[in-house]
């Protein structure tokens, strides 16, 4: 499973802004903006059944993200 964690849209992202500014300095003027995040690849023993999805959702909410300033997306596959 993959957990992607991103700052909420209303939260200022200085790292993303720094990357976007660097893109412009490198001549990549078509880059309008960048938001940086985190990606976690979680390996499971056994199938990604409902119990596993629930467990990884809890892990993402309680450990991998800060729900006050971040959202997460879980990709099962």
What are these regions (language model features)?
Residues 1-77:
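Non-catalytic terminal accessory/regulatory regions of metabolic enzymes
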């Amino acid at each position: 499973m993959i957990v992607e964690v991103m700052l909420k849209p209303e939260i200022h992202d200085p790292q993303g802004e720094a990357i976007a500014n660097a893109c412009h300095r490198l001549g990549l003027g078509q880059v309008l903006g960048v938001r940086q995040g985190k990606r976690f690849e979680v390996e499971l023993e056994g199938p990604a059944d409902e119990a596993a999805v629930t467990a990884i959702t809890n892990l993402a909410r309680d450990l991998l993200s800060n729900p006050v300033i971040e959202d997460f997306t879980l990709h099962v596959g």
